[in-house]
Amino acid sequence: GVYAEWIQANLAIPNAEYGKLAKAFNPVFFDAEEWVKLAKDCGMKYFVVTSKHHDGFAMFHSKVDKYNVVDATPFGRDVIGEIAEACYKHGLKMGLYYSQDLDWHHPDGGGYLSNHIPSQGVTWDNSWDFPDAANKNFDRCFNEKIYPQVEEILRNYGELCLIWFDMPMTLKEHQSRALFDAIKKYQPDCLINSRLGNGAYDYVSLGDNEIPDSMPENTEFDPAL
């Protein structure tokens, strides 16, 4: 990972240290309406924002894990909730990114299997805090955090146009299918990208920063830019 959001993995920052940043996170001038109006003025039809990335920190008020923007920061406001309200007010569709496999805050977060070869020396899982890969069990992470949080975002933030998943490295087929089915249960019109994994998707997401030379035939797709 060469992106800013990968800094915890790139530098192997322990959760105890990385988590201190949350205690200093207080963007008091954050204005969801300003963001949404700018997006709409630029001609955007929908707005996708990160609800949880690989570091495991939720930008919504999660009852599943207190490592979230409401409970773990002095800011204390539900960012996703405010963006959702602004989107509905200004007629912009909203989608959410959610990291359903990698989670560096959970001891059993994905990316630890033997075939998950480090990229440029950076491991996919949190091997600096939780080095015992042999005893990791992604099922615990999925059941304790991933699935319940996906249910939260489906049930608590109104109509979503899509869920943008990422990095399906450890998910079993039945887990991908469980998430797919939950989305269709709570939000029948919500689209699901192919990075949910195991063939459970509505449309294809290309590789990061990949722009095809020509339009793929017979498939709906989006570039990950």
What are these regions (language model features)?
Residues 1-225:
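Mature catalytic domains of secreted/periplasmic carbohydrate-active enzymes
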